[in-house]
Amino acid sequence: MSQTVVLRVAMTCEGCVGAVKRVLGKMEGVESFDVDIKEQKVTVKGNVQPDAVLQTVTKTGKKTAFWEAEGETAKA
């Protein structure tokens, strides 16, 4: 089932953006993604699990959390 996962990722430069794009490009099930450095926002669409996307982006070393973490417990 296709779904959208939105993350807040601490990115400070194009190198950060490139690292996030690289890991998402290799992730199975990802159909498309958008990385917005100004908003610190990463939107991923595809047949993916939110926790798996969070863990994959966290591997870049960037501080990562679900976009709307209020009321949710994010496990990293």
From Swiss-Prot:
Binding-site list for Cu cation: 13, 16
Subcellular location, record wording: Cytoplasm, Cytosol
GO molecular function: metal ion binding
Induction: Induced by excess of copper (at protein level).
First and last residue of the signal peptide: none
Keyword terms of this UniProt record: Acetylation, Chaperone, Copper, Copper transport, Cytoplasm, Ion transport, Metal-binding, Transport
GO cellular component, one term: cytosol
Positions of post-translational N-acetylserine modification: 2
Cofactors: Cu cation
GO biological process entries: copper ion transport
Recorded phenotype for the gene knockout or disruption: No visible phenotype under normal growth conditions, but mutant plants have increased sensitivity to excess of copper.
HMA domain sequence ranges: 2-65
Cofactor note: Binds 1 copper ion per subunit.
Primary localization class, coarse: cytoplasm
Note in the entry: Over-expression of ATX1 confers increased tolerance to copper excess as well as subclinical copper deficiency, but over-expressing plants are hypersensitive to severe copper deficiency.
Similarity remark: Belongs to the ATX1 family.
Assembly description: Interacts with HMA5 and RAN1/HMA7.
Function summary: Plays an important role in copper homeostasis by conferring tolerance to excess of copper and subclinical copper deficiency during vegetative stage. Can complement the yeast mutants atx1 and sod1.
Protein name per the record: Copper transport protein ATX1
Organism: Arabidopsis thaliana (Mouse-ear cress)
